[in-house]
Amino acid sequence: MIRADLATIPTYVPGRRLVDATKLSSNEVSFSPLPAAVDAVTEATWGANRYPDMGAVELREALAEHLEVEFDQVTVGCGSSALCQQLVQATCAQGDEVIFPWRSFEAYPIFAQVAGATPVAIPLTADQNHDLDAMAAAITDKTRLIFICNPNNPSGTTITQAQFDNFMEKVPNDVVVGLDEAYFEFNRADDTPVATEEIHRHDNVIGLRTFSKAYGLAGLRVGYAFGNAEIIAAMNKVAIPFAVNSAAQAAALASLNSADELMERVEETVEKRDAVVSALGAAPTQANFVWLPGEGAAELAAKLAEHGIVIRAFPEGARISVTNAEETDKLLRAWEAINAG
């Protein structure tokens, strides 16, 4: 009754929760949604007896203006993760290949396998960045899609413009490159590709961003993709009907129109991020988290949990979200306590 290959597909593991603990395991912001977004959600719920606008026309129009693209070059989905899955479904058939860095966003291989495609994971370099040369070398006649996570989750590293340009010279025009910029608003790298520019240089590049992180709408699930109109149309074709609810659309639109207020919050996170990097001796990061590679992540997570701090432990290292001043102070006090002995 059940597909036999599902037994081999890993289950997505969300960040851990503990009652009364400070949750730094899911790269969420600690701020509530912007006031305008809260008001928009309240208003939208009065129409919850009606289906949402399946085409999300008003939101897509605003995004098109924001991104400086045409209306048919942008779509929205139930978080950028859903759009990643739609991109796989739109490009891959049984036996096709999806290339991605590893470790990176852990849903990439899941989405590939669910679609019947073959996941091709390329290990990060020693400095925890994309090995773009190895990713290019892995391209075969079965490759249909390549994900680049910039900044990368969980390492927080970014690639340079020259690295991306060199990589794209090796990518066939019929292979789609998904430039996943879920942490775009936190990125302060001077030399790195930006999807809004790359989609005009390459017809096979699709940008992917979200309202879940910097915008503080993780609980409402809304993201957006932009680029080649033909690819966007194909992504819409495989989307779940009415996936982005009315409240999510309203909140995203209101948040998009409150950019100045949003960036004030983001700057606080960036400031605290740099302080955490210094205190923990972590490598520089361009996201709202720090990455501590190496063994012992589970042990570190257990010790911090004893002090009311929940982080994310991976086999390759520990990822710690950075939020606001109050939660950063709690983290640093806990860090000092476990290292005092």
Curated annotation (Swiss-Prot):
Keywords linked to the UniProt accession: Aminotransferase, Pyridoxal phosphate, Transferase
One GO BP: L-histidine biosynthetic process
InterPro entries, sorted: Aminotrans_II_pyridoxalP_BS, Aminotransferase_I/II_large, ArAT, HisP_aminotrans, HistidinolP_aminotransfase, PyrdxlP-dep_Trfase, PyrdxlP-dep_Trfase_major, PyrdxlP-dep_Trfase_small
Cofactor dependency: pyridoxal 5'-phosphate
This enzyme's EC code(s): 2.6.1.57
Origin superkingdom: Bacteria
A Pfam family hit: Aminotran_1_2
Catalytic activity as recorded in UniProt: an aromatic L-alpha-amino acid + 2-oxoglutarate = an aromatic oxo-acid + L-glutamate
Residues modified to N6-(pyridoxal phosphate)lysine: K213
Recorded GO MF terms: aromatic-amino-acid transaminase activity; histidinol-phosphate transaminase activity; pyridoxal phosphate binding
Disruption phenotype: The absence of this gene and the ilvE gene results in an auxotrophic requirement for phenylalanine when the double mutant is grown on minimal medium.
Entry annotated with the keyword Transferase: yes
HAMAP family: HisC_aminotrans_2 (MF_01023), Phe_aminotrans_2 (MF_01513)
Family: Belongs to the class-II pyridoxal-phosphate-dependent aminotransferase family.
Record text on subunit structure and interactions: Homodimer.
Protein role: Aminotransferase that catalyzes the conversion of aromatic amino acids and 2-oxoglutarate into corresponding aromatic oxo acids and L-glutamate. May catalyze the transamination reaction in phenylalanine biosynthesis.
Name of the protein described by the UniProt record: Aromatic amino acid aminotransferase
